[in-house]
From Swiss-Prot:
It comes from the Eukaryota. It comes from Cricetulus griseus. Acts as a co-chaperone for HSP90AA1. Mediates the association of the molecular chaperones HSPA8/HSC70 and HSP90. The modification N6-acetyllysine is found at residues 8, 301, 312, 325, 344, 446. This is Stress-induced-phosphoprotein 1. InterPro entries: STI1/HOP_DP, STI1_HS-bd, TPR-like_helical_dom_sf, TPR_rpt. Residues 205-233 have a biased composition (Basic and acidic residues). Disulfide bonds: none annotated. SMART domains: STI1 (SM00727), TPR (SM00028). The gene is STIP1. TPR repeats lie at residues 4-37, 39-71, 73-105, 225-258, 260-292, 300-333, 360-393, 395-427, 428-461.
Length: 543
């Protein structure tokens, strides 16, 4: 049994430090030695959830409940995994089942409230944004025939992209039928169902269930401690921090087993800007919480406050460490967002610290040597390193674009040329290399435009003048097959995006069947721009 406890503690430390695989290994070894220990399955469930393996987290949560049906945390683990698996109804039932055994468990109560809110949100989600929308409509006889009507498809796409228009379209019987199919309910009988559900009003029952009389069961010292805490909270709201500290200190003396009073003191010191004291108290609170088996959400809050204190001091690495500890105990959107923010700032700081123009020049020279030898992949690596060392040097992007062109990676070459031009709009090479990439892609119209811009900057640029002439001749002598035109057009990311847009495909179908519809669509500047793009690349022609 001693070995089991050692493995469990080792697993707990690994999980707190973010070493999830080590934690899983420790818990699994402990389970082999003591397969009836419900706490081990609970801890491993938390580790699997942290890793993102929610199915295994759910299985361990179920095992925890099987071994210890009267233990609230087992239900919390199981329900949390179900939440991550988007099985909200089952998660709600699990929280409710847990509350039958531990009616005053704060963690289960909060979980149930969260699930009820999530399920309520689902009623207001956009049903027209389902990934299998058209498949669902095709499979139902009520909507199958409607799909042959282009105006119906256009209406569906409108609601898919702008669900706020639903209120103005709800009177359309086709939309009512569609909603019935998508939501899987008969909307005609909804009013009756709602009326039937109204008689037992939820608010009064919630008030009756609120455990206010529970304070009568508390020992006198804990009652007094709660009163002191309330007085401390009032003082805190008024920013009378010294008075708040006195009340929290008194509450802590009356009930030394409750970590909340210590974290409240930490909050006061945080507001006063004494971050060292704040962290010291949070560590103490966590220690008290662990000793008294406090709800892990409270432990998570203490870790998050330590993270916030480091964030305030711009010590982002330390902040991330404690945010991760908080998330290991309990994941909340606020802490996750703060952690991601700290990671983003730290990454940017590291990027800026990496900048060194002297080392960039060394890498550039190495790249030039490799380029002259024809070793383009190696040259590209040196130019990439040079860009990391000096990301504001336009010439580095131009050099790497030349490598990409040699390696036939024309889209990447174009991207680097755009960056080069943005950094130094008067640098001729940026334009000539961009035009060369477009010319290689046989997009002669665009290539001529770019060569023309280069000539506007320097009318004596022979490279631009020769390139312009080549493109003119190639365009004149061009006899592409429709397949070549389509293949070349579909290599353009902008064309790919237009052609994958269901609304645009519907418009193009309408144009084929009814050419008069074009004039109506061209009134929309966004659609007109997309149609012009398709005309430029030769995919469509208007006679």
């Amino acid at each position: 049994m001693e070995q089991v406890n050692e493995l469990k503690e080792k697993g707990n430390k690994a999980l707190s430090a973010g070493n999830i695989d080590d934690a899983l290994q420790c818990y699994s070894e402990a389970i082999k030695l003591d397969p009836q220990n419900h706490v081990l399955y609970s801890n491993r469930s938390a580790a699997y959830a942290k890793k993102g393996d929610y199915q295994k987290a759910y299985e361990d949560g179920c095992k925890t409940v099987d071994l210890k049906p009267d233990w609230g945390k087992g239900y919390s683990r199981k329900a949390a995994a179900l939440e991550f698996l988007n099985r909200f109804e089952e998660a709600k039932r699990t929280y409710e089942e847990g509350l039958k055994h531990e009616a005053n468990n704060l963690q289960l109560k909060e979980g149930l409230q969260n699930m009820e809110a999530r399920l309520a949100e689902r009623k207001f989600m956009n049903p027209f944004n389902l990934p299998n929308l058209y498949q669902k409509l095709e499979n139902d006889p009520r909507t199958r025939t409607l799909l042959s009507d282009p105006t119906y498809r256009e209406l569906i796409e409108q609601l898919r992209n702008k669900p706020s228009d639903l209120g103005t379209k709800i009177q359309d019987p086709r939309i009512m039928t569609t909603l019935s199919v998508l939501l899987g309910v008969d909307l005609g009988s909804m009013d009756e169902e709602e009326e039937a559900a109204t008689p037992p009003p939820p608010p009064p029952s919630k008030k009756e269930a609120k455990p206010e009389p529970m304070e009568e069961d508390l020992p006198e010292n804990k009652k007094q401690a709660l009163k002191e805490k309330e007085m401390g909270n009032e003082a805190y709201k008024k920013k009378d921090f010294d008075m708040a500290l006195k009340h929290y200190d008194r509450a802590k003396e009356l009930d030394p087993t409750n970590m909340t009073y210590i974290t409240n003191q930490a909050a006061v010191h945080f507001e006063k800007g004494d971050y060292n004291k704040c962290r010291e108290l949070c560590e103490k609170a966590i220690e008290v919480g662990r000793e008294n088996r406090e709800d892990y959400r409270q432990i998570a809050k203490a870790y998050a406050r330590i993270g916030n204190s480091y964030f305030k001091e711009e010590r982002y690495k330390d902040a991330i460490h404690f945010y991760n500890k908080s998330l290991a105990e309990h994941r909340t959107p606020d802490v996750l967002k703060k952690c991601q923010q700290a990671e983003k700032i730290l990454k940017e700081q590291e990027r800026l610290a990496y900048i060194n123009p002297d080392l960039a020049l060394e890498e550039k020279n190495k790249g030039n040597e490799c380029f002259q030898k024809g070793d383009y992949p190696q040259a590209m690596k040196h130019y990439t390193e040079a860009i990391k060392r000096n990301p504001k040097d336009a010439k580095l992007y131009s050099n790497r674009a030349a490598c990409y062109t040699k390696l036939l990676e024309f889209q990447l070459a174009l991207k680097d040329c755009e960056e080069c031009i943005q950094l130094e709009p008067t640098f001729i090479k940026g334009y000539t290399r961009k035009a060369a990439a477009l010319e290689a892609m046989k997009d002669y119209t665009k290539a001529m435009d770019v060569y023309q811009k280069a000539l506007e900057l320097d009318s004596s640029c022979k490279e631009a003048a020769d390139g312009y002439q080549r493109c003119m001749m190639a365009q004149y002598n061009r006899h592409d097959s429709p397949e070549d035109v389509k293949r070349r057009a579909m290599a353009d990311p902008e064309v790919q995006q237009i052609m994958s847009d269901p609304a645009m495909r519907l418009i193009l179908e309408q144009m084929q069947k009814d050419p008069q519809a074009l004039s109506e669509h061209l009134k929309n500047p966004v659609i007109a721009q997309k149609i012009q793009k398709l005309m430029d690349v030769g995919l469509i022609a208007i006679r």
